[in-house]
Design a protein with these regions (language model features):
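An aromatic- and histidine-rich active-site surface loop
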Residues: 146-148
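N-terminal glycine-rich phosphate/adenylate-binding segment common to multiple enzyme folds
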Residues: 137-143
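Terminal accessory/targeting
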Residues: 1-6, 16-134, 150-304
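DG-centered beta-turn motif at the end of beta-strands
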Residues: 9-13
Length: 304
């Protein structure tokens, strides 16, 4: 196989413990790239931990800005984001509301607020990671909100207005039928994740022209239908067909893991999306970390 594969971890900077987990993976050469979010209170400490550990990395990972509009504190003045945050500045908007707003007359009001925050979050990460070139930015987002039409429009306008360019923007386009080729796995999938897959594939279709015009290379993401439980056994079974699919369509393949676990005692009011807390503290994050180690794909794909 000649397809390019990226072994990626989201959520560096979500909590100190989660970030330490990710740093352990980096030091052991198990990841090719990570996403960094800048709007949690532990951000500066996590950056310090990264710098302390960096010399132990066998190679330097690619770093993406993990735009976070679902949780944490806004970097903007809360008064400038009345539709997105509460009185404490914590995000309180839902994914679903942003999606539906994309098709309503109020979209421009929301887009103006989104642009302020997206710009500040990109600047915050780029400001402490000199590895990030503002002419070759890598961008993704918490819960893939950048795929929502109004958020995507805000993001691309920020890039254009600031004179920034992106070499990578995650296209959360996950092949659907690959998961149906192994009938023995049917009962292992959560039905709600099929809904996520279909919805994000719809959003992806709306964004293909923007991606092409921005020079973003075509890709597949693997990590939606198995979201929350990217385990070794199923990945081994599905990987050959997933690689074939990516190679056939001339797309790179990003395999997305969440190997960093938030401790229950780290949960505070900045984790403002209550439904997501169980995901953050779930033991399944340890399952994903174990898979990253057992599969040991990061170094293999670097040699291709």
């Amino acid at each position: 196989m000649s397809v390019r594969i990226d072994i990626h971890a989201d959520d560096f900077g979500e909590s100190v413990h989660a970030s330490r987990d990710i740093l352990e993976c980096l030091k052991d050469g198990k990841l090719n790239s990570i996403s960094v979010l800048a709007n949690m209170s532990c951000f500066e400490e996590c950056v310090r931990l990264y710098r302390e550990a960096q010399e132990e990395f066998p190679w330097q990972p690619a770093i993406s800005v993990h735009v976070n509009l679902m949780e944490g504190s806004c970097l903007s003045d809360p008064k400038d984001l009345p539709d997105l945050v509460d009185e404490k500045g914590h995000f309180q908007i839902s994914w679903e509301k942003l999606f539906f707003v994309s098709f309503l007359p109020s979209r421009n009001r929301f887009k103006k607020q989104l642009k302020k925050e997206i710009e500040l979050q990109i600047k915050a990460v780029a400001g402490v990671f000199s590895e990030l070139n503002l002419q070759e930015l890598r961008i993704d987002s918490h819960q893939h909100t950048h795929m929502i039409p109004v958020v995507a429009e805000a993001l691309f306008e920020v890039l254009e207005e600031q004179g920034w360019k992106a070499s990578y923007i995650r296209d959360a386009k996950e092949p659907f039928f690959v998961f149906l080729q192994k009938t023995s796995l049917y009962k292992t999938y959560r039905p709600v994740n099929f809904v996520k897959n279909i919805l994000l594939n719809y959003c992806s279709a709306l964004l293909q022209k923007r991606f092409r015009n921005a020079g973003i290379k075509p890709m597949y993401l693997w990590g939606l239908i198995m979201s929350g439980h990217m385990d070794e056994e199923r990945i081994r079974q599905l990987l050959p067909n997933m690689e074939k699919k990516a190679e056939h369509n001339g797309r790179m393949l990003e395999i997305l893991f969440h190997p960093g676990q938030v401790l229950r005692e780290e949960i505070s009011d900045e984790f403002s999306q209550e439904d997501a807390i169980a995901f953050h503290v779930s033991p399944d994050r340890s399952v994903e970390k174990q898979a990253v180690y057992a599969l040991d794909l990061a170094q293999k794909v670097r040699k291709r």
